[in-house]
Amino acid sequence: MAPRSLLLLFSGALALTETWAGSHSLRYFSTAVSRPGRGEPRYIAVEYVDDTQFLRFDSDAAIPRMEPREPWVEQEGPQYWERTTGYAKANAQTDRVALRNLLRRYNQSEAGSHTLQGMNGCDMGPDGRLLRGYHQHAYDGKDYISLNEDLRSWTAADTVAQITQRFYEAEEYAEEFRTYLEGECLELLRRYLENGKETLQRADPPKAHIAHHPISDHEATLRCWALGFYPAEITLTWQRDGEEQTQDTELVETRPAGDGNFQKWAAVVVPSGEEQRYTCHVQHEGLPQPLTLRWEQSPQPTIPIVGIVAGLVVLGAVVTGAVVAAVMWRKKSSDRNRGSYSQAAV
């Protein structure tokens, strides 16, 4: 099914901003999970502007509907919620049919649980133009089919996915979706950036410090923390006597802090007594200039465990839903993920 127009949801035209601070993205993630013996597959969809989730749909909710996750989107009128909910329900049904088709095509048992994930959306440059568009599916955690960067052709992961590819090509789906990406997706993104500019266009700098953890009489771990920053894009590096220690650095993925901001750390194991030779370097758009930190032997502030635990709790909650499943998969398919539309069948 081809992309549908959402511009009719909005009364009045958005006054376009000629330039934007940096690039921005609109992403729609969906996950459909079959559960034999327990009814229809569960469908969860979440929508993001940059690193901020602002919409969520769960077919298992008491009243399944698209729900706001940010105050700035609550201002939308009843027609907006009726239509976005309608799209989510239509996409849920499409993915349920797709799950049954894939089960048959892969000759799999109906007794097992299977997952179909989707991600689509657009990246917009500072000039307001399309940087890149996305339309991807994964089945049981593996890439299935994706729209190529040229927005004209598809990459199928196997012979089963080639069936979907031939269907998309016969329906000229790439052309229709490209029209959506270059037009409506960017229009929606601009609108959301304007309505939520106080939240979405902020740049909260990280609070950074170094923690020292002795391992033995001969070694210690230096862990460089960056806390409370937004957006999620950040660079943490360790240097020894001015030389980057890329191979020896343990670096965790950026994770939510539980309050709309993010946290991250990078660690190195160093010989005891040589700590002063190591410096941590932090780069983030919220900083007027990069930070350089060196561990000092004086008492350090206690690591804010509550904030860290909150972040882990949030991350764990997301794992049980759809978001982290999509994020784990998108690591392979996107650097950093749509406006609502009715999905094509798989």
Swiss-Prot record:
<feature type="disulfide bond">
    <location>
        <begin position="224"/>
        <end position="280"/>
    </location>
</feature>
<keyword id="KW-0325">Glycoprotein</keyword>
<feature type="topological domain" description="Cytoplasmic">
    <location>
        <begin position="330"/>
        <end position="346"/>
    </location>
</feature>
<feature type="topological domain" description="Extracellular">
    <location>
        <begin position="22"/>
        <end position="305"/>
    </location>
</feature>
<feature type="glycosylation site" description="N-linked (GlcNAc...) asparagine">
    <location>
        <position position="107"/>
    </location>
</feature>
<dbReference type="GO" id="GO:0009897">
    <property type="term" value="C:external side of plasma membrane"/>
</dbReference>
<dbReference type="InterPro" id="IPR003597">
    <property type="entry name" value="Ig_C1-set"/>
</dbReference>
<keyword id="KW-0732">Signal</keyword>
<feature type="region of interest" description="Alpha-3">
    <location>
        <begin position="204"/>
        <end position="295"/>
    </location>
</feature>
<keyword id="KW-0490">MHC I</keyword>
<feature type="domain" description="Ig-like C1-type">
    <location>
        <begin position="206"/>
        <end position="294"/>
    </location>
</feature>
<dbReference type="InterPro" id="IPR013783">
    <property type="entry name" value="Ig-like_fold"/>
</dbReference>
<dbReference type="InterPro" id="IPR037055">
    <property type="entry name" value="MHC_I-like_Ag-recog_sf"/>
</dbReference>
<dbReference type="GO" id="GO:0005615">
    <property type="term" value="C:extracellular space"/>
</dbReference>
<keyword id="KW-0812">Transmembrane</keyword>
<feature type="disulfide bond">
    <location>
        <begin position="122"/>
        <end position="185"/>
    </location>
</feature>
<feature type="region of interest" description="Alpha-2">
    <location>
        <begin position="112"/>
        <end position="203"/>
    </location>
</feature>
<keyword id="KW-1015">Disulfide bond</keyword>
<dbReference type="GO" id="GO:0005102">
    <property type="term" value="F:signaling receptor binding"/>
</dbReference>
<dbReference type="GO" id="GO:0042605">
    <property type="term" value="F:peptide antigen binding"/>
</dbReference>
<comment type="function">
    <text>Involved in the presentation of foreign antigens to the immune system.</text>
</comment>
<comment type="similarity">
    <text>Belongs to the MHC class I family.</text>
</comment>
<dbReference type="InterPro" id="IPR007110">
    <property type="entry name" value="Ig-like_dom"/>
</dbReference>
<dbReference type="GO" id="GO:0002476">
    <property type="term" value="P:antigen processing and presentation of endogenous peptide antigen via MHC class Ib"/>
</dbReference>
<keyword id="KW-0391">Immunity</keyword>
<feature type="signal peptide">
    <location>
        <begin position="1"/>
        <end position="21"/>
    </location>
</feature>
<feature type="transmembrane region" description="Helical">
    <location>
        <begin position="306"/>
        <end position="329"/>
    </location>
</feature>
<dbReference type="GO" id="GO:0002486">
    <property type="term" value="P:antigen processing and presentation of endogenous peptide antigen via MHC class I via ER pathway, TAP-independent"/>
</dbReference>
<dbReference type="InterPro" id="IPR001039">
    <property type="entry name" value="MHC_I_a_a1/a2"/>
</dbReference>
<protein>
    <recommendedName>
        <fullName>Patr class I histocompatibility antigen, CH28 alpha chain</fullName>
    </recommendedName>
</protein>
<dbReference type="GO" id="GO:0006955">
    <property type="term" value="P:immune response"/>
</dbReference>
<dbReference type="InterPro" id="IPR011162">
    <property type="entry name" value="MHC_I/II-like_Ag-recog"/>
</dbReference>
<dbReference type="InterPro" id="IPR050208">
    <property type="entry name" value="MHC_class-I_related"/>
</dbReference>
<feature type="region of interest" description="Alpha-1">
    <location>
        <begin position="22"/>
        <end position="111"/>
    </location>
</feature>
<dbReference type="InterPro" id="IPR003006">
    <property type="entry name" value="Ig/MHC_CS"/>
</dbReference>
<dbReference type="InterPro" id="IPR036179">
    <property type="entry name" value="Ig-like_dom_sf"/>
</dbReference>
<keyword id="KW-1133">Transmembrane helix</keyword>
<dbReference type="Pfam" id="PF00129">
    <property type="entry name" value="MHC_I"/>
</dbReference>
<dbReference type="InterPro" id="IPR011161">
    <property type="entry name" value="MHC_I-like_Ag-recog"/>
</dbReference>
<feature type="region of interest" description="Connecting peptide">
    <location>
        <begin position="296"/>
        <end position="305"/>
    </location>
</feature>
<dbReference type="GO" id="GO:0042612">
    <property type="term" value="C:MHC class I protein complex"/>
</dbReference>
<keyword id="KW-0472">Membrane</keyword>
